[in-house]
Amino acid sequence: MLATRRLLSWSLPARVSVRFSGDTTAPKKTSFGSLKDEDRIFTNLYGRHDWRLKGALSRGDWYKTKEILLKGPDWILGEIKTSGLRGRGGAGFPTGLKWSFMNKPSDGRPKYLVVNADEGEPGTCKDREILRHDPHKLVEGCLVGGRAMGARAAYIYIRGEFYNEASNLQVAIREAYEAGLIGKNACGSGYDFDVFVVRGAGAYICGEETALIESIEGKQGKPRLKPPFPADVGVFGCPTTVANVETVAVSPTICRRGGTWFSGFGRERNSGTKLFNISGHVNHPCTVEEEMSVPLKELIEKHAGGVTGGWENLLAVIPGGSSTPLIPKSVCETVLMDFDALVQAQTGLGTAAVIVMDRSTDIVKAIARLIEFYKHESCGQCTPCREGVDWMNKVMARFVRGDARPAEIDSLWEISKQIEGHTICALGDGAAWPVQGLIRHFRPELEERMQRFAQQHQARQAAS
């Protein structure tokens, strides 16, 4: 969420070299997907079991947590780095590296972990399922992650609209306190750690890490200029790491089963399992945990029952939430669902929220609606975003009608490029990329619509 700009610098295709030698090591995997049930981390994703402490314990949560804590920060960070885990909130930054930024000599200030549960990206609902059905995984993850970075407390910033999810999370935290799992001498480890819940107020911009920090501090949710980065000056002026719900929730399982186990899924630099949301024109919309690098076509057909009307009825897919550029059917045939493959396809994994659009979709109107959302959610702090997104919104409204000239398509492209990379946070990028994807793959549709409007206008003038 609002973190996809950094994805580009961490998702360049890995350089491949081939050496002929007597090496007898096992060849690298070439097929991905079909995750086995015993390898799933989120075992109560659909709420079929008890989400409270008793049920969580029966599913393996809080197992040997004390031993993990006693092994110390360096061991935990080593396992996270070995796992190859990358941030699950959109940026894809290596988690072990990010968490290690907090392990500097103490200057007397406390350190904090902030969990970004402000899930507001259109099409994204993976974190909601964790909060609702597996809250103890997140609470335990806060403890393990906090230990790794020497934090004294975690603040879970949860989207204001998530009333039931916040209630379940509060119950899970209370149960953990009562059982001695968090708080003073957490799990009997001698480590003190508190967990607090902060409710948001429905602002999408607060999904950006520094705007989220501002909101926790009681200020307007507007992004800060960086540097200083949160690892130096974060919440209450103290060193802070902001992490996604899914990223934090998987850390205890990685420590229990080993970083090598986790890195065995997916391609190199794109390892592990991942929660995918599949919505739109599919027969069975769902949230599913699957192996990273699973083919997009397999993901849709196996878990979502396929595209309505069959695969040939597919028009386009937004692969990573509303802020990632769409890809047409021709790309969807072969693309893999991971960071590097989707960057090569000129889009991004983002939050892995797959939005499927069949041939009945008015693709121009769909993208125009997304731009209207970003225009509404812009905080107005940066001129390129405030003025540029408003301008794009007005132009896209005319493109929906066809009331424009083909040359304006190039103008819209140029404006989107002027917004991209010229704002404090990535909301401007998130607004620009859907437009760029539309122009890149559906320019003929735009031109045809404009031509049709011009012909109708001429016919009306001739009739009058």
Swiss-Prot record:
GO cellular component: mitochondrial inner membrane; respiratory chain complex I
Membrane topology: Peripheral membrane protein
InterPro entries: ComplexI_51kDa_subunit (IPR050837), NADH-UbQ_OxRdtase_51kDa_CS (IPR001949), NADH-UbQ_OxRdtase_suF (IPR011537), Nuo51_FMN-bd (IPR011538), Nuo51_FMN-bd_sf (IPR037225), Nuop51_4Fe4S-bd (IPR019575), Nuop51_4Fe4S-bd_sf (IPR037207), SLBB_dom (IPR054765)
Source domain of life: Eukaryota
EC number from the UniProt entry: 7.1.1.2
Gene encoding the protein: NDUFV1
Identification of the protein by name: NADH dehydrogenase [ubiquinone] flavoprotein 1, mitochondrial
GO biological process terms held by the UniProt record: mitochondrial electron transport, NADH to ubiquinone
Catalytic activity entry: a ubiquinone + NADH + 5 H(+)(in) = a ubiquinol + NAD(+) + 4 H(+)(out)
